[in-house]
């Protein structure tokens, strides 16, 4: 593949890494995420999670006041006090994540030192770690990368042979994948993050890592430093990507090819059947992916190769060429891939390209819809269970649905131009 790789910089339109707390706190019910930030940070997380604060969710915000920001108060002492009160009130917490934000980074609040102080005080009763969820230089999915990277140094050492799935998956999807790996002959499969933060998987030279998400660059680097082997494979989105992803693990564990085909061939055939009605809607349509989630390259590969869509432009917030090499190789020749964002210029290219569908952030969706451009929220793809060969049809439906909706609206507004009028 010879993609047209470009890079641009300028004003961006993305969520910050605090958003990842929404799925991480659901994944690890014995963990608590304490954001050190402003009231804006608190409103963002509460709104994104859809959880009222009186329901006692497993996240909260230590709000920096104007005195903190002006340097008139000792924010470190105040943070220690808030953390102690939280742990006394919530004794079920086993891991406390101190999460940095834009305001805490601006005033140079040392959360690493705060975590160290609290760990010394708690003496192992609760593990305290820290990472940055700031959106100053990152996009929202990198919050998970920061959280997992903070856990890697704490993983126990082991040379035992095992497969480690890295990246948050829906529980049902993860259970299904572990079952399929077992049928392939891979019995020892662990996950990071685990379902309980106190049950961290081991890592060492016998560990083979399969990344489930493309945005875990720092986590992958740290796992390599611990001796693990990180496999190169497309990511498990769609039938083709999921199969190649599982085949990479099967090859590393020397699973018999006949056994691999016996397991995966029927699944792929069933996935193709599930894809068929959505391909009828999507084939030949033009799609423009704006940069936000870092899922853009795997999605572009899936939408082109399995759904027949034409790629106008594929935007990515950041491009790790080594980690994304397998995805880049599967894109059609000449695909325009733009790293970074100058949102005004990209919107100009959207209007000039006349795409049938635009994948973008929530902040851009309504203005584009008002211009008559059909959109898909990129954040919905992060919250939906789309990984694995069994989910290929559901993934395609996420893109065919807005086009179908647009057609219904058009038919209702212009019944004389439609052979199939919509009745209330």
From Swiss-Prot:
Binds 1 [4Fe-4S] cluster per heterodimer. The cluster is bound at the heterodimer interface by residues from both subunits. [4Fe-4S] cluster binds at residues 16, 41, 102. It catalyses: chlorophyllide a + oxidized 2[4Fe-4S]-[ferredoxin] + 2 ADP + 2 phosphate = protochlorophyllide a + reduced 2[4Fe-4S]-[ferredoxin] + 2 ATP + 2 H2O. The keyword tRNA-binding does not apply. Pfam families: Oxidored_nitro (PF00148). It is an enzyme of class 1 (oxidoreductase). Protochlorophyllide reductase is composed of three subunits; ChlL, ChlN and ChlB. Forms a heterotetramer of two ChlB and two ChlN subunits. This is Light-independent protochlorophyllide reductase subunit N. The gene is chlN.
